[in-house]
Amino acid sequence: MLTIVWLASAWIYLSSMRILDTQHVPDLRNLSSVTDPERLAEGERLARVYGCADACHGDRMQGQVIYSHPLNGRMVAPNLTQAAQQYTLPELEAIARQGIRPDGTSVFGMPSSSLAAMTDRDLSAVLGFIREQPAQVNVPGENDYGLLTRYRIVTGALPAQAAVQVQQPWRETFRDNEARLGEYLATVACSQCHGMDLEGRPGGAPSLDKMHDYDRFEFVALMERGMAPGERSLGLMTETARKRFAHLTEEEVDALYVYLKTRR
């Protein structure tokens, strides 16, 4: 029995290493540098909406440990303030939207497959804001995947983001169309937890078909305060709404509501 367990563990480890070490070649995409104060302020807002600031990477984007567990190992969200000064704009773009690090390996855990849809204008503003921030001295460390996380990598439950790119960046042709603006926001933000089809994930976030049951007042309360009808807390969604979606504009909340109410 111990031999079988050892062989299975060895197979998982070796198989995961092949995936982790796979080299990917990013498309070269040049973004414009942003220095305009209004654009930088918009970049700060979007960095919060999309989870870069005050969420995954910490309140000052200083990086943090996402989880640490004997079987799962250790997953880290890196220090963005240092990465923004270390890498070029094309390298940062490849990490964010293509899921490819400068060394050619894929990122895991970061929602690049969702961020892939972000427009050049939005991503330029976000990166401009991050690059303007003082470098934080925090060193969260490196990923150290445990057996269960490696099993998820091998089975595709935790996919290499470089291998699951399903879309190109949106062009700036949708802002005046309320439903299309809502679709864009859902694609870049909501899909990070609810899946690219917004149908939810097993054991995780539910299908957003639930939004058909919300009226506008209830939806605004969900986005701004993370509270479901009856003032019910929704755990991670409540935390996410307060840290991220509370920074959506009224126009964006309305657009998201229209899109989610009409999608089938």
Where do the PLM segments sit?
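Proline-centered turn/helix-capping motifs that create local helix->coil transitions or kinks
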Residues: C56-M61, N138, A228-R232
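A cross-kingdom marker for long, charged
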Residues: F217-E218, G230-R264
